Amino acid sequence: MNTPPELIAFTGFDSWNDYENEIYAIYLETVVNANLLFLNTPVKVRFRPTTKDKAFGFWHLISEAADQNNKDEDDRLPDLKRCERIRWVAWCITNAHQVGFLYWENQRGRETHVVIWAEHLDFVVILAKRKTDLDEKYYLLKTAYCLREHTKRKLRKEYESFHTSKKG
């Protein structure tokens, strides 16, 4: 597995606002404007509704809901581990087929998602399969986060189940 991009630590910045602006600029460069592809299919991001003049999708990469039942975007809390790893999102998408990565599909409600797991780094990126009105396929970047132990076990079972069902 190749080496992940360098983490962007908060410690080198004078304020949270400076840090947030820097990681947003990196998000725009490495994700939004990078023409990312996953399995030769474009990866797009959600912009609306914006929060604090930044794209909706950005917040789902760098923050988490304090309460899973609260869908108010303004109440999301920054997660420094997610923030530090903003460069890892594009890196995971473009390297998903390499050794050290696992990927598979799962169902979440009516949506088909793709989970990309940088296994030895315990970091996942979630994409949703979508189509345009003209039936053109694309992936929507949903979120990315560091795994906790209980989630690793759950994802391992899900991965094994997906690949077992593909063989049968």
Please name every model-derived segment.
Residues 1-168:
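Ribonuclease/tRNase effector modules and their secretory precursors
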